[in-house]
Every structure is written in C-alpha cells, then in structure tokens.
Amino acid sequence: MIEPSEDSFETMMELKNPSSKQMESSEGSSNTVEETPGSSGAQAGAQAGAQAEAQAETQVEAQAEAQAEAQVEAQVEAQAGSDSGPAQEEKEPPSGPLKEMQELPTNLLQEVEEPSSGPHQEMQELPTDLLQEVEEPSSGPHQEMQELPTDLLREVEEPSSGPYQEMQELPTDLLREVEEPSSGPYQEMQELPTDLLREVEEPSSGPYQEMQELPTDLLREVEEPSSGPYQEMQELPTDLLREVEEPSSDPCEASSNDLPQDMEESSDDGSNQESSDGSNHELSNGSNHESSFGSNPESSDVSNLESSGGSNQESSDGSQKESSYDSNPELSDNSNQELSDNSNQESSDSSNQSSDISNQEGSEPLSEASDYSMDETINSSETQSDQDDTDLGDDEEEEEEEGGEEEGQPKNSPEEVVATMGNVISLFLRMQDLKEQQRVAERLMMQAINEGRLPSLRPFSGDRRDYHEFVVLCQMTMQNYPSMLYNDELRVKFVIRHLTDLALEWANDLVEQNSPVINNFSAFLEAMSEKFEYRQTLRVAEDAMFNIRQGNRCAADYINEFRGLIPTLGWPDEVLQAHLCQGLNEEIRHYLFRIPQPNSLDNLIVLVLQLEEKLAERRALLRLPPESRPRSVAWMDAPAPEKWRVSSWLPNEFHPDIDRDHLFLLLLVRVDPYHSVAVRALVDSGAEGNYMDERFAQEHYVELYEKPYPQIIQGVDGIPIGNEPVWLCTEPLVCVHQKHYEYIEFDILPSPNFSIVLGMKWLRTHAPEVDWMRGRCTFHSPYCLRNCFTPPPPCIALETYSISLLPGLPHTYSDLADVFNPREADDETSDQPSSDGSDDLSESEPSELQQAGDSDQSGVFYESGARETLEPVSARMQEKARQQEKAREQEEYWILYDMLTDRQDYTQMVPELFDQLHGAAWFTKLELLGIKESEMRHTVTHTEDTWRASFGFGLHQMRCYRPFTMNSYSDEGNNIVHFILKDILGLFVICHGREVLVYSMSQEEHSQHVRQVLVRFRYHNIYCSLDKTQFHRQTAEILGFNISPKGVKLNKNLMNLIVGCPVPGSRRCLQSVIDLVYPYRHFVENFAVIAAPLVRQLLSSEPYYWGEEEQEALESLKRAFRKSPVLYHPKPQNPFYLETDITGSFLSASLVQTDDETGKKSTCAFYSRPLSTMEVEYPRVEMRILPIRAAFMVWCRYLENTEEPIMILLNTEDLASLNNDRLTVLLPGHWVFFFSHFNFGVMEMPAEGDTQALFRRCWNQRGFRARFLRPLLLMSIRANLRYFDRSSETEDKEDDEEEEEEDGEEEEGEEEEDGEEEEGEEEEDGEEEEEEEEDDEEEEGEEEEDGEEEEGEEEEDGEEEEGEEEEDGEEEEGEEEGEEEEEGEEEEEEEEDEEEEEEEEEEEEEEEEEEEEEEEEEEEEEEDEEEEDEEEEDEEVPSMVRELLAAIPMDHILNGLLAHFSVAQIRAVVLNFFRGLLYWKSLLGVAAVLVMLRARQPLSPVPAPNLEVARPQHRHTLRLILDSTLIASSGMATAIAQLLSQMPPLVGANTLPARELAELFLGPRCWHRNALHSQPPRGMRFTPGFWLTLCEFFGVRVNPEDDVFPDPYQHRYLELHVVGDEDVVLREALQDDLQRYRQCGLHDGLQDTSQDAQDNDVQEDLFGDQEAVTFRPRNLLDPEVLDFLNNRLLYTLGTDGRLTLLSRDQVAQALTRFLAMASRMALPSPAREQARLEELSDSDDELD
C-alpha cells in the first residue's frame, strides 16, 4: 500500500492549527529524518513564526482549490484512457495528464534535469538529447511545467513539487517555514481535508490504481505489461542510458530499458539495474553522513529513508533506486528513530515490498534478508566505473544467469565468507560513527530548544574534533532552507563558504582540479569524511594495537591478530615492527634482539615464528642430560650482545624507578638516515622543552651540536631544573609515532630513567588529545593534518642500488670483492668502504666487524697471517696419512666385518648429525680456489669420519657413535680450512674440501655470517670462485646431501653413483659396493632385509658365487635408494610415532612425525638389523617388544623424557596381543628399568591410504594448534621462496624418472616387471608431491570454489569409510582363518590315525587353496583401494583460508555485536539456535526420548516368597561408567545415560535388589529367576543379554562398589586408560606395581600359556571360587556378547553374498529403530527407587 505524503498531512495540520507547525518541525529536526524530493521527509525549521503562516493561509487556500479540481479531472481522464496497469511507478501516482509531456518543446525539455514521474508513455517520445541529461525526475504536474518560460526552466535544477511560479510569489519568511512539498500540487494538498488525505494512498484514476491493487507476489512475477508505454520504452537504445547520472524515479523505467527482450521474460518487474549499480555510488560517496539529519532531499536521503524497512512512505521519486540498501546496518539507528515518530503499518508494508523487489535481482541467494547488498556497497566505486564502460543489458543478463547458477550451489567459498565478515565488521564500526553523529545532533537540538534557536555555524578549520558538529549544523541549516539550497552545487558551495584554514585549502584544491565531487554533495561529504573524520574503525584498531599482547598464546595466534589490524591502521613498516616486538613474550624478545634486525615486517614475522620453534625445541632438549644435548642449545644459552637498535623497552613487569602513571609514547627516532631507534618517550607537561638522554645519544652515535649560548632548563613554573645549563643539542631528527611524522630538535641532558622527554613545547605545537585513563595521544589539530601525516621523503641508501665491481657478487659483499678476484685485486678495490660502515680489514686499525668476528680467535694465530706457516704442518699430516694407508686398508675389511656382524643397538648418527641444521633457512655455498679437492674414498670409516670432521665434531664426541678406531682426516686443504674456521664450524659453517657451506636462520643474520667467513678468508689469503659460489639460497648440496629447511635428502650425484654400480665380479668388488652404500643405510627402509643376500655372500667362507638372489638384492637395493625419501629434521617438541616390525630374522623400525604444513606422515630416520642367535629364541611376546626396545635405544636422544607420549604404531593383531598381555607387565626384568625412562603408548597403525590419520590425532593434543598455525603463516609470507624450492624439486623428480625409465629398459623378465612397477610407484609419488605443491598454492589463496571442494571431501569421506570397513572385515576374516589353522594343527598332534591325518591334510590343502583365492581377491581389493586412494588424493584440496578462519577472534566480534542488541532480539536468536539443535539432534537421542516417555512397562511381582527370605540387605547401587570417547556423536553419551536410566526393568528382576543386578547380568541363574513369573509381561522382553550387549557396545561397563564385590588381589588386572581413540592405550603403572605383579606370579603364569588360556583360567578361578563377580576390563567382552555382535550387529549380508562390517553409526541407527519399535509395544511403568544409574565422577578417587 502507498502512504500519503507526510508533508501533505503536516501541511493540512498547519492549516487547522498553525501553532503545531513549529513543534513538529523541531521534532522532525531532532529526529534527523531525511526526505526525498516529493516524498515529504524534511521538516521545516523551528524559526518560523505564526504571522508568516497567517499571511500565506488565504493565498494558499485559493490556489489549492483550483489545483484540486484540476487534479480530479486529470485522474478521471487517466482512468478512462488506461487499458491495463502498465509498469509504472509504484510509489506515487501520476501528477498530471499523460498527454501534456508529449507536447513540450525540445528546447524546453533539454533544460529539464529531472524528468517527470508520469507514465512511460511520456518517456518514450523524449528525444535522445533529452535522455542524456536526465538526472532526477521532478514530481510537479506537467501542465504547470508547460506554462513556465524557457529562461526560468533553465535555472531550475531541482524544482519543488508545487508550481514554481507560485513558490516564487511566497515571501521569504514564509519560504523559511515551507517544508519540501509532496509530489502533488502544494495548493491542493493544503486544502484537502484529513479524510481526503487518508484516501490519497490509493488514487482512483490512472493505471497506478491497478498496479496498487496487485499483491506483492504478483508484482514480482510480472514479466511484461500487456500494453502501452512499457513496450515502447524497450525500444530505446541502451547507449542512451549510459549517460544518465541519476536514474529515473520510475523503477520500471530504469529496469526495462536495460533489459533485453529475452531477459524481460524471466526478470522480475520490481527489480532494476540501479539497485545494484547506480545507487551504490551515492551511498559510498558519503550519503551516510547526512542520513541521520535529512538535509539532503535527494536520492541519498531516499536511501537512508527506505533502509529502515518501514519508515514514512515510499512514494518519492527515485526511491526504488535506493531500496537495495534497506538492510544496511549503518542506517539502522536512523531508521529506528524515524520509525518512532513518522512510520505506520501501511508504510512498513510498502517499504518492505519495495525492498523485496529491488533486492530480488543481482544478489546471492544465501543472503536474501539483508547481507547481499554489502558487497555492492563496499565496491560501489568499481561498480560505477564498470557501469560506464559496459552494456547494461548484458550485465543484467549475466547477473541473472549467475544468480540462477548460484541458486543450485548456495554455498559460499571461504574467501567470500571472510570478505562478508569484513564487510559486516566495517559496517558495524561505521554505524558507530553515525551514532556519534546522531548524539551530536541530539545535543545540538536540545541546545536549540533551550535557547530558542540553532547554534551559530562556526567556520571549520580542519580540526577533526569539530567535524561532527560542523556537519550536523550544516545539514540542519540546509534542511531549514530547502528552496535556497535545492541542488548539490549550492549545498557544496554553502559548505565551502564555512571552511577556513586547512579545510579551505583542501576544498580549493578540489575546485582547482575540477573534481567531480564538487557537483555531488554526497561525494563531497564522503571525501571530507575521509580527510577530517576520526572514524570508529580507526579508533578501535588503534586501541587494539596498543593493548594487544602475546601473553600465554602461541606466536602464531598473536601474529594473526596483529596482522588483522594492519590494513585498517596503515602505519609504516618500522612502526609496526616496534609494536609487534613490544607485545611479544620476554623470552622471545631476549633471543630476538641478539639477531640482526630484519629489514621488513614479513621477515620479522618469519624470524619470530622460527625463534618460537627453536625455543620449543630447546625446552625439549633441556630434559636430556647435559652430555646428550646438541651444541645448538649451548650456543643459544651463551651470552651475546643485543644487535637491535632498541632502547628503553620496558618489560611487562613494573619498573621500580618509574611511576606507571606517566604517559609514554612508543617513538621511533631516526638517529641516522638509515636507522631508527624505538624508544619510549615520556610526555611531561611540567617540562618546557624536548630533551634526550646523554647516554642514549652516545650509544646510538647521534650527531650533537653546540648551542650558541648555554641554556638553563626550567619547568613550567620557571624553577630551574638541574645544576648545569644545557649546551648541546641535536639536529632536527625525524620522529615517528603511528602515522605521525615530525622533526624534533632535542636538548641533551643526563636523564637516567627516560631517554626521551617531550615537554610543553611539543604539546603546544601539536595540541594532541590526551586520554589519561588509557595513556594515549591522538592528533587532530589542523597543524598535524597539514604537516605531520605526510611521510618525509625516504633516504635512499646508495648501497642498495650500488653496482658491484664483479658481476654476480651481491652488493652486500662488494667491499670483499678481492676475495673472489685474486688476480685483479688492486688498491681501489681494497680501499672501497664496506657496506656496513666499517673500514677495510686489511688496514692497520681493525674495525668493529673484525673485532666482532675475530675477537674469540687466538691472537698468536692471526699475527702470523701467512699461509706458509701452515704448510709444514699439513705436509707432516699428509706424510703420516701415507704411512697409515696400508694399515688402514687392512683394517677396513675387519671394521666392516664387525659392523655387519654386530647385533648391538648403538645411537644412530644421521639424525643427530643434522641437529645443528634445525631452523636453518638460508644457505650460501662457497667454492674455494687453491685448495686441492679432497678425494672422497667410499669406505665406511672414511665417509663417517669425514662427516664428523665437516660438521665440527671432536674426538670425544666421535666415540659415542661407533666402537671402531678413529682415523684423522688426511686432506691437507681440509686441515687448513678447518683450522681457520674451527671455532664456528658446526655453528653456522660446514666445510668439506673446497666446499664451504654457510647456513643461518634469518636473511639478515645470514649476511653477517657470510661476511665473517669471507673476512677470515681474506685475512689468510684464501680465495673463492665467484662462478661456482651460490649466494642466499633456500637449498644447498654438500657431502652428497641435499639440505633444505625441512630435512635432508641424497643428491643426484650420489644417487647416480649408487645406481651405476656394476655387478661385482669378486668379493673385493662386493666389499666396495657395500662400503659405498652402508653409510647411507639410514635413508632406506628395511636396508638390512634388502641387503641380506649381499652381506651373506661377503661374509661367507665359501667360494664367491653371484646368483639370481644376489642380483635381485642388488637391483632391489638400487630401487630402494632411488625411492629414498626426504628425512625430516626431528622436532623434539612434537609427538613421535614408532613403526616397528619383525621380518623373518630381521627387525626394523622407523621414526615418524607429522608434517606441519601438509599434515602427512614425515619420516625422520630408518633402522634395521639382523637378530642375534639369542634373540631368535625369544618368546613371542618379547619378540614383538624387541624392535620397540631397539628403536628406543637407537633414538634415545629424541625419545627420552618426551612431553607427549610416544605412540607405537602396531597392526591389529599385535595391538590386541600387547594390550591383553599388558606390555609393561610382561617386560623382562632387565628391560623394565630401561622402559621406565620413556613416556609411550600403543595405538593401531592407520590405513595406508589415510595420510591424515596421525595429523587428526595430533590436532586434539595440547599445543598442536600453535604448531599448525605457524607453518601456515610461513607459507603465506614466503610463497616466492617455496616456489623456488618446488621448481628445483620438480627438476630432481624429472631426472629421477628418466633414470628409472632407462633402468627399466635394461631389465628383463621379472626384473623388468619389477622395474616397471617401481617406476609406476615413483611416478605416483611424483604426482603426490606435485599435488602437495598444488595444495600449497591453493592454500595461498589460488583455490577453486568451495562447492566443488566440499563435494570432493564428502566423496573422500565416503570412500574412506568403505575402505575402513573392508579392511576391518578382511582382518577379522584373517583372524578366524588363523584360529582354524591352529585348531587343525592341534588335532593333528593329538590324533594318531593316518587316515584322519590324510583327511586333515586334504582339508588343509583345500583351505590353502581357499586362502590363495582369498588372497588374490584381497590383492584385487587392495589395488582398487589404492586407485580409490589416488582419486581421493587428487580430490583432496586443503584450504588455508578455512584453517585461518579458526584463528579469527569471533568472541570479540560477537561480544561487540551483542552489546548493541536488545534482550528480546538476543532471546529470539538463542531460541532459534536451540530450535535448530533440537531439529538436528542425533536419531539415537530421539529414540531415547521415546523410550523414556513410553517404554515404562509395569511388571507383576514375583510370587515366590522364598526369594524374599533369602534376599540380602540393600547395598550401594551399581555405577555405569560411560566412556565418551567411544561414542560417535557428542550428545550420544547423555542420551544413552538417560536411556539406560529409564530402561524397562529386566524380565524377572523387578523385585531383586540392586546388589544382585551384576550377578543377574552374567550369572547362570538368571533364566531360572525369569521362569518364576506367573504370567509373561506384555510387550518386548528385554533380556539381560540385550542390555549387556548394549552396554558393552557403547562403551558402558558395570562396575560394582568395592565393598560389594571384593576383587581378589592376586588376580587383579592392570587398569588401562583410554585416551583420544579406542585403540590408544597409555601406560600408568609404577615400578613397584610392576614388581608386585611379578611377585604374585602373574608374569610366570601368563608367559607360558596362550592368551586365551590365560583369560579362561582367570575367569574360571573368579567364578569357581566365589559367587561374587569381578568384571573384566572393557576390552574383554563376554563370549556371548561377541557372538551376538558378530552375528547380529556388526555384519550384514551384502549384494555379493559376503558379510560386510557395519560402521558404528549404522549400528546406532539400527538400535534406534529397534528401540523405537520396542517403545511402541511397551507400557509405561514407574521408575524403581533402588535400581538407579549414576554418572561417572570426574575424580579418580571415586573410581578407585
């Protein structure tokens, strides 16, 4: 329904009661209602008088009568002439006859900027040049417009709704009171009575009447009007509408012209192009600033008016255009206030109708209510620019097609969610600005009411503190004089006339630039707001930045929150670095300041994350004994000076000498053109000038100047401060605080507590706004806006743009060019100043760098400085090496023999060798000249000794690795370089022969490390090859290893050497092959198993023979090396996993962790060896524990005293055996003490295709979230570096694949097939790695739509579940088959008849054949599963955006939003939320409710009196212990507890006390008691077996009280606690408990018998000796229960005739249906008092 114009109603009320005019005007102004032209929203000023009304009353009445008659006649004619309602205005009726507009002359229409709001028939015949100038429609009648002269119309920019001639005749004092008239004639509306005005909502004539009668849903479905002007409007060319500045008032005109013919049939009648394109420009250009006050009667007012969803009327011109902003949160305050005074129910319906129509098109289906106009609002400038260059019809068509596609896929991508969330937050904060503006308006209005007039409009100088008051007064003034300020240009000129100083300069610049905002008042206000308004968004961001601290959080969470504030603040990089460091923990800052300061914020973030990782590793390593700790820990703990230019950074604790009530600023003082110092500056209003501490100036080499005359320091009161005058000062230094730049000249004085003091001189200059409560200063003065918010020109460091004398040499080392060019080194090169400001080191006076780099060296050694001194020493060492050559060759065989035959487990070398490389991210490889290249002899001793020497290990550290004789390195060049770099070798340098590798954690630190090495080489006349040197890389190769930040891999050269080994023709050649590959055995899984035939041949005393077995072993070994993975650096702070196995007479183990970036399994090391003769005879249980013990022994450095439990991954069979045998109880006596040093548990090994199983477990562990977010940040910051790594790895893969293809061509027969299989597997590995790279790229933001991702994830989940079910089924079938074989073997031993034996053998053969067939089927299934896994991996697309969404502080956002909602709104939201929870509740919960309500069955009492006599006294009730980790959903535990608490009484047990319930469950006499019933109960018979099955299946166990059923001590079971997963068991037994178990004979009895026999014996003892029942642990189910689960619950018959294992969810659904049927058959019964259930208490004391 269309409402009457509000100003028409007020005008009539003025005629009745003139005195009410002033009251309503003042109310309208205070309510800040905005009005549109013709919609009567603007209120008249409060300054009008009663005399002006009386003078105008008679004249207005006469004119209104004539206009009323003309209006009625025009409406009758229009009604008679209209056929059916064309698509006209829905908001206002036509105000003039339809034929009038057609007769207007062209020259007159060209001057009209606002076309009329009449029907479309008039618009069709308008010429092209008229349409190009159309801006806004006028609402006056066309008949009156024709009578106006042309020269008068040319001056009219926005005519009023009444006739312009009569408005000119009104006196000035009357014009001040005239509100903006409505769309009808002003005279008519004044004379219309109240009852007539009420009927104006639905005019009686014209097509408008028919349109009004259509319902909203019908209007939306109108495809094309049946006749008249609408069809003709479609014929207008599209290019005419491109120049329309403001869309037409008729919504149908604006939309129909833009739509092509085919689009009109499917488009809505009420939607238009302006709702998505045209109107956004006005809102984004500042219409929100005036939205609260109604000063702008144009479309921006309409936008705010309609945005309330029900304010006033919708009959204004152009209102449809702005209705897309009806849900804008910024305007809710204005609309709420508007609703309180000016709205009614009909207007609310009308505005809602228009908003629905306008928002139906060009929006996303998910956000139908209010959210889908926000993106258009934020991106309005882009939309407006696109509209000028694009065909509107095509855009409409594309938008509608996209909308149709999105309806099918309503899910938004994570990027859209993040963008929408950002829009919501920005709009919410923008709404706070409008609230502040509204509060200012209310204050000014109250002041105006008290004083009787508006406050005077003071000029605005640019002070941001006066902005809101100035804008509000301007809008109120323009509201009171609408006829004088009736267009945008006049309003802008009015505002500019009241600007002074900085604000006037800004406006004059816009005028001189001929900016388009001068002609658009909304855009002008927006630009002014951007310049002079201190917005709430910036205020909130600054408060958060000053208060943000890391606290107990991980650095990744802190950095995520910090980075979220950066775009809003826009502070310079150096200021952000200072604030980031200020909020860090003291421990991180301590080590951070010892590293050179990074040159950017991103590098600082990377460095902080690396430091946190190093500190976590350090804390883990400190748990080891001092002799086992790596050297990196000692280096971190060594004292070192701070290298940052940081001063007075107070820690979080209170300083004893500083009063915390002082006001401090974090100030960055640029002490030289290239460096700034962060310092806390004291703001002291008691000091007169600005002062700097004398020590601070000396420490940072600040240039000081002498004053012309000494100056005495005085306070504000004039009292001298100090005894000595000030005679030194600094030059003006650049000081930066946030975005505030200034030049300050400091006076120098001794100030021990404060480095910088800012006094009254600084306060007077900047006039900051000081918040003493929060200790903050903000700068709003015009002086700061003019001078302090523009950064000074940067100082260009010449070293950054310098060109090195040698091409390829980085400029950082340009002063050391002579090290790389020994022949052309001259004086010019040597005299070149160094880049860090230090002098050349060859001069007599050493520089700072030389002192810092060489201070710890021996002075005698460096005094010699000549290489000749070292040559004799090297010659003697070389001679000694020659003498030992023969003896070494003789010993090599015996050393290798000892290593191959040794069966002891020693500490492994390879993982510990690379411990010092942990955290290294930058590498530089130097190639030396003049050094003889060391010849790498591929023997075990020489290779491993070379590794130790290259990494800087000493002889005392070498003894812990191998028991063979140590040999010194024999290379002369090695000894020279090692002697030069001996103190830094292994800290950040690795040296081997000509190759020197420098590695560092950060780029800034790396440059200093390289300089330190180059300085030493220059001092000793050792030169480097520039062509072969690699600077600042992410990967490096040395000693046959490819080193990266993640780990170590064998390089291509070594791989080619191993793969190219020929077939050995003698035992000596075979020894050379084994010498070559044996040192790298830790890179190959099951190395001892693969190389066993070669080792046997080498150690054999028989003649040398090379057969097929040896050839196959050699080829398998080559393939294994080609597939050798990257060995990741072990991280002691992360959880470890052990994979152990026994293969024949060999044991193997692998140390595993999870990759933080991909979540996949990452191997740290492999280990394998043959079993000794004694170990082969170990019992079966000890044999399973043997590889675990070996792994603990080999990797004890990482596994001892770990914080997280070491999870031992076992297969299903071993896991069940070790769980039942009690791993820690069955340990041999000499192993118990050894295992007590380790914190370990056991869990089932995940499926091969499930690469994320370990990652999912780690996600639930404490502290893993921090470890997970840290690499995500590193990925997002260092994308370019990772791209370089991927490119190099891709090249390696391609080379490897080519080599494999060549090898595959050479192989024949089965070997050829094996080679092809391996190649296929490697190709799959390559594809997986490429997929990982693609995943990384997608995590950086280049991912596809979320709909496809989620579909892929659902498919993967389904396939994984099917795969798990099949595997479980196969495992159980395998167990059953194994049991059958054991039974068959026992029968063969017992029976003596040969015939029976033959029959059994035949049966065994048949079984074997069946097993072979089943194995073939299993292999086929495994192949299918592998294919499915490959497809899953192809579809798996991890999203970094989704993971980062978890780090968004939603609690702060939610609290901020809830603070602005009423209690009723919050209550409604909460009720809707819980209604949704109830709707999506688990099906089992619904079934539980049904059982509780309806399954109460009364049972008849037991008639047998003898039971009552024999009944014991009442005891404590039983307790059900719920294990929530075994229940599928989170709410299922509660549902089961309620279900069991209200379950029907057991048949025959309703009169039994709770004491006998346990015996009733498991006792043999329960069926006898059931037979005592005289009559069977009605309904389902819930047998005890059923409830026992239900309890056991859902992890519920019945545990009696201690006093009821005493547990025999000698048969007590070791309690096992389940954590995280059903198959994860942790050990919690003390040493004395283990010894007590052993003393009781439990170990001896269990070790000699099988597990089943042990369990049966224990149960027979329990039931045979006593009537009381001791319950077994949850793992040992009753045989009846197992039979029930196997036959009825867990398996179902599939389509192929095979039994398929059901998942737990399927079983729960089946039980749900069963319980639902049972509840329908059972009758309710009252709950018993004695039998009740209690939930498990959280305390462990009650459980014991």
Swiss-Prot record:
Main location: membrane
Induction: Down-regulated during time-course of induced adipogenesis in 3T3L1 cells; Lipid accumulation is unchanged during adipocyte differentiation when Rtl1 is overexpressed.
Pfam families documented for this protein: DUF4939, RT_RNaseH_2
Disruption phenotype: Mice suffer from late fetal or neonatal lethality. Mice overexpressing Rtl1 show notable overgrowth and morphological abnormalities of the placenta.
Transmembrane regions: 1473-1493, 1520-1540
Keywords: Developmental protein, Membrane, Transmembrane, Transmembrane helix
Region (Disordered) residue spans: 1-416, 823-859, 1287-1439
Function: Plays an essential role in capillaries endothelial cells for the maintenance of feto-maternal interface and for development of the placenta.
Protein name: Retrotransposon-like protein 1
Species in which this protein is naturally found: Mus musculus (Mouse)
